Amino acid sequence: MSLQFLKAGTADAVSLMCISKKAFDSDVEVGASSVGGPPGYATLSFHTKMARMNCLYKLVDDYKIVGGALLFLKDNELNVGRIFVDPEYFRKGYGIFMMQQIEAMFPQVKTFSLDTPIWNVRTNAFYQKLGYVEVRRDGDFVYYEKRRDTE
């Protein structure tokens, strides 16, 4: 296993779109009422746009893309818009590796934020395991943050 977490280009958009679709559609196994996902999760135009905006990242294992992320940096805060791993690679440490790399890539960031659906038992447990703390919730989502002192 030779893992790398890298910025994705527009040439990676098709692969990342396919993985995103498989990953989010698999949420029916952990509480989703039907297949589906966040806005643009299964469209090439969305992933291409995110790559052009330098917000799309890829997780590569031995030259094969196995996952991705959307990251939005603003000042000292990073919003993890989403991460996704090909279901073939679930429960093999890829998500943990990706989140560790995200935190390491942005040493200036003091607050990492993200949200996940209330019904998704898999992702809620995952983010809590990584030290993310619930800061609020609404009818649909749980909002998490992880703060660090950069001084």
Task: Describe each region flagged by the PLM.
Residues 90, 113-124, 140-141:
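Conserved beta-strand-loop-alpha-helix junction that forms the acyl-donor binding cleft
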Residues 44-58:
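A short helix-loop-beta-strand connector motif used in the catalytic cores of GNAT acetyltransferases and
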Residues 18-46:
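Conserved GNAT-fold acetyl-CoA-binding loop/helix
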Residues 89, 93-101:
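Conserved acetyl-CoA pyrophosphate-binding loop and the N-cap/start of the following alpha-helix
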Residues 4-18:
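A short beta-loop-alpha structural element at the N-terminal edge
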Residues 96-97, 104, 118-137:
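Conserved active-site alpha-helix within GNAT-family acetyltransferase domains
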Residues 140-151:
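Terminal substrate-recognition subdomain of acyl/acetyltransferases
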Residues 58, 64-72, 79-84:
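Conserved beta-strand in the GNAT
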